[in-house]
Structure formats: structure tokens, C-alpha cells
Amino acid sequence: MGQYKIWVDADACPNPIKEILFRAAERKSLPLVLVANQMLRVPPSPYISQVRVGSGFDVADQYIVDHVEATHLVITADIPLAAQVIEKGALALNPRGELYTTDNIRQKLTMRDFMEDLRSSGVHTGGPDALSAADKQAFANSLDKWLVRV
């Protein structure tokens, strides 16, 4: 088994969540890799790196899936990516602090597909609420639970 590492699906990850991750990587001396199709601002650190992938549908997701290992954590709001990560034995956590598991991922995929069908038929479903202080705290708490094991 490889070493612990955190991967971030960084194009859509909110900045306050990235800040929490930057602090955690420094505190725990833990590799943190942000994957995006654009250059990101990351603090200078031997633990924090970024991978810039080409633009295109799910290119960053595929990079993460190709490199993730069972000891890794992936931060993503992308449910299909979370499903692939879980299939590889790793953990996936969304930016609101919800851990995707083998028990809940099928339901999440079904709901995502249902909402996508509604949108494609012209129904306006709205987007997610803005990230709240409670969401940030929930994320930090869930991350800390994982970090305790590292």
C-alpha cells in the first residue's frame, strides 16, 4: 500500500476549502495534489503541488482516477468521479463534508442522473447553495476524522 495523499478535483473546489486543505497538508506534512485544467495559486510548500491537465471533458477526473490509491482521499463534488474513486478502494469527500461511501454512492448517482434528466427536459433545478460557515466546519470535521488515521 502507498503513502497517504489527498487529491483535489480543484477546478470546482471552493477557495475556502482549498485553504483548509493547505493548512492540513502543512500541519500533517501530507502530500496534497490539486488537479485542474488551469493554473492555480498554491502556497509554496514541499507538501502542496498542482497538476495542470489539458482542457476537455473529465480530463482532470481521469487523471485522478489513474493515480489514486486505496490510502488516498479525494476531494470532489463530482459524483461519478467519487464513484470511480470508491471503486478503486479510496475515499471521496465532498466540499460540504459529506463522505461518499459504497453505501450511499449508488443513491447519489441515481439522484444526479434524475436531476440531469430534469434539466435536459427544460426544468430549472437551480444550483447548490453557497458554501456556508456550517459547510466549511462540516468539511473540516470530516477531514480531521480522516487525518486522525494518517
From Swiss-Prot:
Q: Where is the signal peptide?
A: none
Among InterPro entries, the record links this protein to: UPF0178
For this chain, the family text in UniProt reads:
Belongs to the UPF0178 family.
Q: What NCBIfam families does the record point to?
A: PRK00124.1 (NF001095)
User: What protein is this chain from?
Assistant: UPF0178 protein Shewmr4_1560
Q: Per the UniProt entry, what species is this protein from, by scientific name?
A: Shewanella sp. (strain MR-4)
